[in-house]
């Protein structure tokens, strides 16, 4: 049963998967089936991933077929992790925090691990403004990029795209500072109204480390972010840090360690919350 439910999800039919599980729970007289099925779907997805991985490692299998098997194995492992993190629901993972905390690095890692798109405010903002995504912007362009109007348009786009995917029962990773309480509250309100699960993952680091990272970023050309070391005090002053009472669906993760360790800690935290 879990194999079929999982395969229906993977092939783009979550509605049929849900209906199938509903019918089975009713037919078996098992009201707890919905609480258990995601565990077994995750396990079955891992089995499919293992089979694909083994096939991809066999020398006698043609190279093209091995590549397909490798891609299929990766896809199934992503599904296994999705079930562990979000069950069968379309979770919205919001990676937020001050500039320099590693939001884009971790959002991209979450995107790769879960197979969900990474929607970054920096890219959306520049796309709306018709500005090249990478490379430094001059003072005049930066002033145009960070008007209140364009900022609200950028965050509205993040909300809209996350909701559009959630209606199709698909998860999303959002990447933005979310420095204002009002920005977070508008997203929360929209997701709650649509009954979409979400979690804010606030990344943190010591001030000295943030300054060091921003100085390093100032020398880079291939970055979509415009935050620089010279902006640190201004950006810190504008940041309205969430407090413990703002939202129970909020976690803090330190980013002092290696990026891969931070990614693992985020995933473990999300899995613990799902339990």
Where are these regions (language model features)?
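Active-site activation/catalytic loop segments of kinase-like enzymes and analogous catalytic loops
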Residues: 1-28, 42-60
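ATP/Mg2+ or Mg2+-diphosphate-binding catalytic cores
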Residues: 50-98
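Conserved lysine of the Walker
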Residues: 103
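Hydrophobic positions on the alpha1 helix immediately C-terminal to the Walker A/P-loop
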Residues: 106
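Conserved substrate/cofactor phosphate-moiety recognition/catalytic segment
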Residues: 111-170
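Loop/turn-to-beta-strand initiation segments
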Residues: 168-172, 197-199
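Conserved phosphate-donor/acceptor-positioning beta-strand/loop module used by diverse small-molecule
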Residues: 194-214
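Small-molecule kinase domains that catalyze NTP-dependent phosphoryl transfer to phosphate-bearing small molecules
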Residues: 216-265, 273-275
């Amino acid at each position: 049963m879990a194999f079929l439910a999982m395969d229906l999800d993977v092939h783009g039919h979550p509605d049929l998967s849900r209906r199938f599980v509903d019918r089975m729970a009713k037919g078996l007289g098992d009201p707890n089936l919905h609480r258990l099925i995601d565990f077994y779907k995750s396990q079955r997805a891992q089995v499919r991933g293992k089979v694909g991985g083994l096939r991809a490692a066999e020398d006698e299998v043609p190279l093209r077929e091995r590549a397909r098997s490798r891609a299929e194995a990766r896809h199934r492992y992503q599904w296994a992790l999705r079930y562990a993190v979000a069950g069968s629901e379309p979770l919205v993972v919001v990676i937020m925090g001050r500039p320099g905390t590693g939001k884009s690095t971790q959002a991209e890692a979450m995107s790769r691990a879960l197979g969900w798109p990474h929607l970054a405010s920096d890219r959306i903002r520049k796309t709306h403004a018709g500005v090249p995504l990478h490379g430094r912007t001059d003072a005049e362009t930066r002033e145009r990029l960070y008007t209140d109007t364009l900022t609200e348009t950028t965050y509205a786009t993040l909300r809209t795209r996350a909701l559009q995917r959630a209606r199709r029962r698909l998860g999303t990773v959002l990447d933005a500072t979310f420095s204002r309480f009002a920005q977070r509250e508008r997203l929360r309100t929209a997701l709650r109204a649509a009954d979409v699960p979400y979690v804010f993952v606030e990344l943190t680091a010591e001030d000295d480390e943030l300054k060091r990272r921003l100085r390093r970023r100032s020398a880079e050309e291939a970055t979509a972010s415009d935050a620089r070391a010279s902006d640190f005090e201004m950006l810190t002053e504008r940041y309205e840090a969430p407090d413990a009472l703002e939202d129970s669906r909020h976690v803090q993760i330190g980013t002092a360690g290696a990026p891969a360790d931070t990614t693992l800690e985020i995933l473990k935290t999300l899995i613990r919350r799902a339990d």
